[in-house]
Amino acid sequence: MPKEPAIIIANHQSAWETLCFQLIFPAQSYLLKRNLLWIPFFGWGLAMNRPIAIDRSKKTRALDVLVKEGRKRLDEGRWLVIFPEGTRTDPGAPGKFQAGGAMVASRTGSPVVPVAHNAGVFWPKNSFLKHPGTIDVVIGPAIESTDKKARQINQESEGWIRGCLQKLPAQRK
């Protein structure tokens, strides 16, 4: 992993990664939809980690906020965590990767650390019930962003994550 602050690009399957990434990586700020901050207790806890909260209905404005605030957080020494699918997906069925995180990387020159996991197998989305088992987390090599366009960075990180996901168990045994 890079020594300097980086942008973590990861698939999003459950609440598990939002909790456990805090134990794996240095101080982080998450990109999230603004209305998550309005949830009593949960949202207040999220706010303590200096997230980048966006209004997803205003895409151009959201991208401007992400780049501006992302640069600030990186300058403060915080790592950014971005789930480019934009929402939780089912194991074995990753969603379309949006390029916001790659755009921040391209404009700041910060490295991207791709991360793949299968947390949704044991912590299904929209379910209070959790299942026992071992969640696999694979941290990829840093993708340098200097002199690269966002599209290339996005393709590299998405390709790496999708390749890993094909090798991880997508259902409980």
What are these regions (language model features)?
Residues P2-N11, L36-I39, V67-R71, P91-Q98:
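Short low-complexity stretches enriched in small and charged residues
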Residues M1-E4, I24-P26, I52-I54, P84-E85, ...:
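N-terminal start-of-chain detector that recognizes signal peptides
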Residues M1-K3, W38, K59-A62, I143-K149:
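A short acidic, often aromatic-flanked loop/helix-cap motif at beta-alpha or helix-coil junctions
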